[in-house]
């Protein structure tokens, strides 16, 4: 039997590190676009006894006994995901977004096939063909980017590259793009060259679920997402598709046994909770506020003389170019971190600096909106960020902003004490 000992009793060193992270999350303002706060119910599911159960296979077709209850849980998650996103197929087993993407590649492509995806330097993701990723090492990756003048996807370039290279698959999606993607334009281009259209909507899945961003699921052949970020669920992945029996079979076998072994049943239960929450009116109102907050912040930066890539935002994030300020993203990240404001350095289109230094920062509003920030609070916050950057990291300015951050965090706690 296990002794009923708490972490703090058994491993005080680890307990202190966890407590410090708890404190950081409460006392710092989180603006990393891919981060959010899970509900207590999601965390309860992730910490449940479901973590003990091995369940290789799928509901009704397991390789282990004792799966009668986890079958119910996984089927609930599948059914809710399909209902939420209007999908005909859902696989809730991917451990993460990258694993979901990897399974799609495995299902639809052969090594060496040509893939057309957005360049990491222009707002794409590692798994969209970056040379350092499996997607760029295993496949012949061709990259498209943004229009230099508008900061928006250059669809003419996408079509030109597609006609030239005849990709087997086109990837639409992003990790740092602030405008609405024209999914149908991508579909039309893919159809011209006989390519699969694969959409990675990891960043905007919550917005899509709430109806405040276009839904790609019935346009693309396959769509993937993470379940955290704007969906506010566990750190995990999801694959969706419109009806196509051949593709569905390929996806099933690509996830298991092709790409993974046993699913994480505690995470799947947490996804089921997340999907149920995302069907609520409160969640829809939250997503609308996420976008309003991002737009309000972008307006403040523009008024302060900063360049926002593409001139604004239609979703939960935007890129702030610091080239005009002669400030690196790395420095801005560090200065703001000292003021208890968490962002991430990010390359901007045609960035003259390396990806380890960058000339910009990425700002997202999902987490601060979860805390309860509205336009008033985020406008103040944008002003504080501009103050810190304009001061070039002046210690007095940082200290002043840090005090303001502490006050507003105390007013808007993440979790009730």
From Swiss-Prot:
UniProt keyword list: Amino-acid biosynthesis, Cytoplasm, One-carbon metabolism, Pyridoxal phosphate, Transferase
Site (Plays an important role in substrate specificity) residue list: 228
Which PROSITE patterns does UniProt cross-reference here? SHMT
Known catalytic reactions:
(6R)-5,10-methylene-5,6,7,8-tetrahydrofolate + glycine + H2O = (6S)-5,6,7,8-tetrahydrofolate + L-serine
> Pfam families, from UniProt?
SHMT
| BP term (GO), one | tetrahydrofolate interconversion
Question: What is its biological role?
Answer: Catalyzes the reversible interconversion of serine and glycine with tetrahydrofolate (THF) serving as the one-carbon carrier. This reaction serves as the major source of one-carbon groups required for the biosynthesis of purines, thymidylate, methionine, and other important biomolecules. Also exhibits THF-independent aldolase activity toward beta-hydroxyamino acids, producing glycine and aldehydes, via a retro-aldol mechanism.
Q: Which protein family is it in?
A: Belongs to the SHMT family.
Would you tell me the protein name for this molecule?
Serine hydroxymethyltransferase
The UniProt gene name for this protein comes to: glyA
